[in-house]
């Protein structure tokens, strides 16, 4: 029991310490796994299947699944007999999903409570980042998710 708790604590810590770059890559890997299943077998992918295919700690995958649902990229549907068993399906037509669109949706989700127009510096930073995001959105390197399948 204690070793289980220690292992779980280690996993939770790992999930918090995962780099932003790695988190983005796992987000896309999870989306690819779900879309591949959706297009191949049809229907939603059980969470345990996603974890098994990616061979990543449960906590990290769960965090990312939660983020993708919050961001409106995946929908969670009950699966199997258990209350806790959940499967995931794309929330939109996979044909229209782009790599950057998914990342941007996740980055934007959450409660915005800060007014970024309060200082000149924040206003300038906001404008620069919006320009950069627009460039990424329009870039030919912003491939459709299905092009990575």
Where are these regions (language model features)?
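Pore domain of cation channels
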Residues: 1-2
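Non-catalytic alpha-helical coupling and interface elements of nucleotide-dependent molecular machines
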Residues: 5, 35, 73, 107-111, ...
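Non-transmembrane accessory domains of multi-pass membrane transporters/channels
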Residues: 6-80, 88-89
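Short, surface-exposed, charged/polar-biased interaction segments
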Residues: 51, 71, 82, 109, ...
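Short flexible coil/turn linkers enriched for glycine and charged/polar residues
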Residues: 80-84, 96
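Residue-level detector of functional hotspots within protein domains
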Residues: 83, 88, 131
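Non-DNA-binding regulatory cores of transcription-related proteins
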Residues: 91-149
């Amino acid at each position: 029991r204690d070793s289980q708790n220690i292992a779980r604590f280690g996993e939770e810590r790992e999930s918090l310490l995962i780099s932003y770059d790695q988190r983005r890559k796992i987000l896309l890997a999870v989306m690819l796994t779900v879309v591949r299943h959706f297009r191949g077998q049809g229907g939603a992918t059980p969470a345990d299947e996603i974890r098994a295919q990616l061979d990543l700690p449960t906590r990290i995958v769960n965090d990312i699944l939660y983020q993708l649902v919050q961001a409106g990229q995946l929908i969670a549907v009950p699966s199997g007999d258990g209350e806790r068993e959940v499967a995931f399906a794309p929330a939109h037509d996979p044909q229209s999903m782009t790599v950057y669109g998914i990342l941007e949706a996740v980055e934007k989700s959450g409660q915005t409570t800060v007014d970024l127009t309060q200082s000149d510096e924040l206003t300038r930073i906001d404008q620069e980042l919006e320009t950069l995001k627009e460039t990424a959105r329009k870039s030919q390197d912003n491939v459709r998710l299905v092009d990575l399948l």
